[in-house]
Amino acid sequence: MPLSHEEWQFAGTQRAGLYGWFARLYAEEVSEPVYRSHFADGGFAPFAGLAELSLEAEVQRLDAAIATLRAEQLPRLELAADFAQLFLLDGKTSALPYASAYTGTDGASPLFGAAEARMRDFLAASGLSIQADFREPADHLAVPLALMAELAGAASSAEDIPTAAAAQADFLRTAVLDWLPRFVERCQQARPRFDVYPALAALLLGFVRADVAFLEDVGGSAAVS
């Protein structure tokens, strides 16, 4: 599917923003300012447009989860408790947000393993590094999502659109889709008090799959070196 440079640039800007928000929501618990500006008045506004990508059910699920949360007396603190339960405890009862926890054949790969080293290689190849105040290994889910935001934004001005699209699709398949479905499954099994984070995980998986399909369509037969 050929795109004009204007269409590609617009898509890149929109995609970068979405990946940036997903990265932020997994990097840390929702702050009070973010809760007030993006959760307190309804569904999560930055993701509303994803319903147009055949993700209406996932968006509606997230909106319903946020509505249930908002009925609580201290909703942001409840959400923070769910964040801790899901992402900060041991792997037996939570959904660890690290690729190394899911990429082994037996589901018991050591943390800081090959997946973490591979993500550091991706960062180095892109001339990027993890922010000093983010004290997590490189295979934390927020890292490839943040890198994808950078790639989508930087490639919006690329002259060779098919090659840029193919490179991004290859990165998503290798660094994200290789383990994201298993992480999403664990999020559903962990059963936190509210459905916000399980719903968010399902929406993320649907978005990444839709984005890869879009990039493959744009990239066509372009080779990725």
Give the ranges of each region predicted by the language model.
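Surface/interface-facing alpha-helical segments and adjacent flexible terminal/loop regions used
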Residues: 1-225
